[in-house]
UniProtKB/Swiss-Prot annotation:
<keyword id="KW-0057">Aromatic amino acid biosynthesis</keyword>
<feature type="binding site">
    <location>
        <position position="181"/>
    </location>
    <ligand>
        <name>Zn(2+)</name>
    </ligand>
</feature>
<dbReference type="InterPro" id="IPR050071">
    <property type="entry name" value="Dehydroquinate_synthase"/>
</dbReference>
<keyword id="KW-0963">Cytoplasm</keyword>
<dbReference type="InterPro" id="IPR030960">
    <property type="entry name" value="DHQS/DOIS_N"/>
</dbReference>
<keyword id="KW-0862">Zinc</keyword>
<feature type="binding site">
    <location>
        <position position="139"/>
    </location>
    <ligand>
        <name>NAD(+)</name>
    </ligand>
</feature>
<dbReference type="GO" id="GO:0009073">
    <property type="term" value="P:aromatic amino acid family biosynthetic process"/>
</dbReference>
<dbReference type="GO" id="GO:0046872">
    <property type="term" value="F:metal ion binding"/>
</dbReference>
<feature type="binding site">
    <location>
        <begin position="103"/>
        <end position="107"/>
    </location>
    <ligand>
        <name>NAD(+)</name>
    </ligand>
</feature>
<keyword id="KW-0479">Metal-binding</keyword>
<dbReference type="Pfam" id="PF01761">
    <property type="entry name" value="DHQ_synthase"/>
</dbReference>
<keyword id="KW-0028">Amino-acid biosynthesis</keyword>
<dbReference type="GO" id="GO:0009423">
    <property type="term" value="P:chorismate biosynthetic process"/>
</dbReference>
<dbReference type="Pfam" id="PF24621">
    <property type="entry name" value="DHQS_C"/>
</dbReference>
<dbReference type="InterPro" id="IPR016037">
    <property type="entry name" value="DHQ_synth_AroB"/>
</dbReference>
<dbReference type="GO" id="GO:0008652">
    <property type="term" value="P:amino acid biosynthetic process"/>
</dbReference>
Length: 359
C-alpha cells in the first residue's frame, strides 16, 4: 500500500493506493462518525458493497443506497433522492458519506456531501481507472440537460482510498475510458508517460504497469490542484480534450459513449486545433492510430451539427462572455488556454472533419 497527500486550500487529505483496501476502510478513517452513508451503483454494489460492509462488524450506524449505473444518474432527481435518504436515515453534521464507485458515483455523492447541512465529510473509494482523475481534486457535480457538470462545487474529500483490485472486473469500454484521462495527463505534464502509453496496447498492460500509470496520473493532477484548487488558472489545463468531449457526450446522449471515449476524441481535436493555431506538429496521427488500434470509437459529426456543437461548447464552464476558452498545446507538456470566437471554432471543426474523413 502506498500513500500520497494532496494539499488543498481547506485541508490536506491522503490518497491510499493498494490491493484489498475495500475490506478495511475503517482502518483509514481515524475520525469517529455518527453515521456512515455508502452511495454506490448497481454494478459496483453487486460486486463490492458486501466487501466494504465486511470491514464494519456492526452495521447499526451504516446505511447505503444504490443508484443505476451510468452518466444519466448524475441528475437533479437522484441528487434530491439522496438528500432525502440521508435525512430519513438520520445523518447529521457529524456523519460520513462514502462514495463507492466510478466518476458518476463520486461526482454525485460528493455534491450531496457538499450541500447536506451545508457540508459533511466524505471519502472517495474509486473503482474505475477513470476515477483516478475525478476522485482527486474536489470537483463535484451533476449534469443539466443543457450541458455536463454545470451544477456543482469544489469540495475536497477527507480521503481517497483506491483499491486497484476492483479494476480487474472493468469491461473494455471502461478501460478505454480511464486510459483517455491518463493520456490527457501525459500530454499536459508527463511526456514520458504519454510516449510509453503509445508504445503499448491496452490489452498488453499488466496490473503493475497500470499502477505505475495511475500513480503518475494522480501526481500530475495533485500537483496542479495544489497550485490552483478552484480552477482560476492552471487547473483549466486539466480540461484538455474536454471542450469538444463534453459537447460530443451531450449530442450523442449521456451513457451512449463513455466520458473517456468522448475525451479521447476531444484530445484529437485539441491537437488538430493546436497545430493550426501555433503552426506546429504534434503527435496527432500517432494518437489517432493508438486510439484506432485500441478500438476507441472515432466519433464523427455532420456539417449541420457544427452549430450545435459550438453552442454546447459555449456553455462550457471555461467560457467567458459567450466566448469559447479552449485548452491547447504549444508542445507536449506546454498547455495554454486560448479564446476562440464562433467563426474560428467553425473553421476548426470543418477542417477537423475534412481531416478525419481522409483517414
Amino acid at each position: 500500500m502506498e500513500e500520497m497527500t494532496v494539499q488543498s486550500n481547506q485541508s490536506s487529505y491522503p490518497i491510499y493506493i493498494g490491493q484489498g483496501l475495500r475490506y478495511q476502510l475503517s482502518s483509514y478513517i481515524e475520525k469517529k462518525y455518527t453515521k456512515l452513508f455508502i452511495i454506490t451503483d448497481d454494478q459496483v454494489g453487486s460486486r463490492y458493497l458486501k466487501d466494504v460492509l465486511h470491514g464494519y462488524p456492526s452495521e447499526e450506524n451504516i446505511c447505503h443506497f444504490t443508484i443505476p449505473s451510468g452518466e444519466s444518474s448524475k441528475s437533479i432527481d437522484n441528487f434530491y433522492r439522496l438528500q432525502t435518504e440521508a435525512l430519513q436515515n438520520g445523518l447529521d453534521r457529524h456523519s460520513l458519506i462514502i462514495a463507492l464507485g466510478g466518476g458518476v458515483v463520486g461526482d454525485l455523492a460528493g455534491l450531496v456531501a457538499a450541500t447536506f447541512m451545508r457540508g459533511i465529510d466524505y471519502i472517495q473509494v474509486p473503482t474505475t481507472i477513470l476515477a483516478h482523475d475525478s476522485s482527486v481534486g474536489g470537483k463535484v457535480a451533476i449534469n443539466h440537460h443543457l450541458g455536463k457538470n454545470l451544477i456543482g462545487s469544489f469540495f475536497p474529500p477527507v480521503a481517497v482510498i483506491y483499491d486497484i483490485e476492483t479494476l480487474s472486473t472493468l469491461p473494455p469500454h471502461e478501460i478505454r475510458s480511464g486510459y483517455a484521462e491518463i493520456v490527457k495527463e501525459g500530454l499536459i505534464a508527463n511526456q514520458k508517460m504519454f510516449l510509453s502509453l503509445l508504445d503499448h496496447s491496452l490489452a498488453s498492460i499488466k496490473p503493475h504497469q497500470l499502477e505505475i500509470y495511475l500513480k503518475a496520473g494522480i501526481q500530475v493532477k495533485s500537483r496542479i490542484v495544489e497550485q490552483d484548487e478552484k480552477e482560476a488558472n492552471i487547473r483549466k489545463f486539466l480540461n484538455l480534450g474536454h471542450t469538444l468531449g463534453h459537447a460530443l457526450e451531450t449530442i450523442h446522449g449521456y451513457g451512449n459513449i463513455t466520458h473517456g471515449e468522448a475525451v479521447a476524441n476531444g484530445l484529437l481535436f485539441a491537437l488538430h486545433v493546436s497545430e493550426y493555431e501555433f503552426e506546429i506538429q504534434l503527435p496527432f496521427y500517432q494518437l489517432y492510430q493508438w486510439l484506432k488500434d485500441n478500438e476507441y470509437p472515432i466519433l464523427s459529426f455532420s456539417e449541420e451539427e457544427i452549430t450545435q456543437l459550438i453552442e454546447l461548447m459555449k456553455t462550457d464552464k471555461k467560457s467567458v462572455g459567450g466566448t469559447i476558452q479552449m485548452v491547447l498545446l504549444k508542445e507536449v507538456e506546454d498547455p495554454v488556454t486560448v479564446s476562440l470566437d464562433n467563426s474560428m471554432m467553425k473553421q476548426h471543426l470543418s477542417t477537423y472533419l475534412e481531416r478525419m474523413e481522409k483517414l
